From Swiss-Prot:
The keyword Amino-acid biosynthesis belongs to this UniProt entry's keyword annotation: no
Protein name listed in UniProt: 2-C-methyl-D-erythritol 4-phosphate cytidylyltransferase, chloroplastic
Species name: Arabidopsis thaliana
Gene name tied to this protein: ISPD
Residues under site feature: Positions MEP for the nucleophilic attack: R228, K284
Induction trigger: Circadian-regulated with a peak in the late period of the light phase.
Recorded family membership: Belongs to the IspD/TarI cytidylyltransferase family. IspD subfamily.
Repressor listed as a keyword: no
């Protein structure tokens, strides 16, 4: 296993070809690091007839399970996925946004992209990203069975979600919002939150808090210890009926409210939000340590 130090940090891969620093991945995929490692570009020399095989081989952890219509949990082709891929990833301390950093040879954002693309419930994926990185997703447009659209990211998360919401199909029955920096979400959990979102109107994946959490004041003094049994850590996807999300955005915009996640928009409407229990492996990759943990989880799964 070779190791290369670049602006992205240390990257491991079976093969490196100099001087263009092309990294050979799996059997078919190649990454090119160009323009001082500012953009990740797929080589056009990849034979398109192999892309489906490469896709299936590269995402075993999250979407290798086959699907048939009997497993559809909501109406087929009724879900619009908004994949948030416009963050800067400053905590990763790398020159490239975290969602495009290779994770075992594949950009982080592509893991969940492929997972959603193989679900029969999904009609389309709206990728909210800088146009500079669109070709990473466009390379697979002919190999997936969903529509692919794009939206421009906003200044804050809620602005990016709103931008993506403007691009969804008007006939979609559910909006499924996901952070592309969570590559390890599995199909079973997605199906669970889709079903709950359809039933309640809004649902979010979450896991019970494992750590002791204390409320602390501005002087760094403990105010009280919170009851861990009532605390859950929120994840994504977060699933909301589009008419409910649009109504929530109207309220947020009219009152100048700021929210840190999507179901918070619905909470302002006093509408119930269901928490679907997810998996602790559905981590958000925001630091180098997270990247190492994700690699370990993927390696163990394979």
């Amino acid at each position: 296993m070779a190791m290369l130090q670049t602006n992205l940090g240390f990257i491991t891969s079976p093969t490196f070809l100099c001087p263009k620093l092309k990294v050979k991945l799996n059997s078919y995929l190649w990454f090119s690091y160009r323009s001082q490692v500012q953009k990740l570009d797929f080589s056009k020399r990849v034979n398109r007839s192999y892309k489906r095989d490469a896709l299936l081989l590269s995402i075993k952890c999250s979407s290798s399970t086959g699907f048939d219509n009997s497993n559809v949990v909501v109406k087929e082709k009724s879900v619009s996925v908004i994949l948030l891929a416009g963050g800067q990833g400053k905590r990763m301390k790398m020159s490239m946004p975290k969602q495009y950093i290779p994770l075992l040879g594949q950009p982080i954002a592509l893991y969940s992209f492929f997972t959603f693309s193989r679900m029969p419930e999904v009609k389309e994926i709206v990728v909210v990203c800088d146009p500079f990185f669109r070709d990473i997703f466009e390379e697979y447009e002919e190999s997936i069975d969903v529509d692919l659209r794009f939206a421009i990211p906003g200044k804050e998360r809620q602005d990016s979600v709103y931008s993506g919401l403007q691009e969804i199909d008007v006939n979609s029955e559910l909006v499924c919002i996901h952070d592309s920096a969570r590559p390890l979400v599995n199909t079973e959990d997605v199906e669970k939150v889709l079903k709950d979102g359809s039933a309640v109107g809004a649902a979010v994946l979450g896991v019970p808090a494992k750590a002791t959490i204390k409320e602390v004041n501005s002087d760094s003094l403990v105010v009280k210890t919170l009851d861990r049994k009532t605390l859950w850590e929120m994840q994504t996807p977060q699933v909301i009926k589009p008419e409910l999300l649009k109504k929530g955005f109207e309220l947020v915009k009219s009152e100048g409210l700021e929210v840190t996640d999507d179901v918070s928009i619905v909470e302002y409407l006093k509408h119930p939000v269901y928490v679907s229990q997810g998996s602790y492996t559905n981590i958000k990759v925001t630091t180098p340590d997270d990247l190492l943990l994700a690699e370990r989880i993927l390696s163990e799964d394979s």
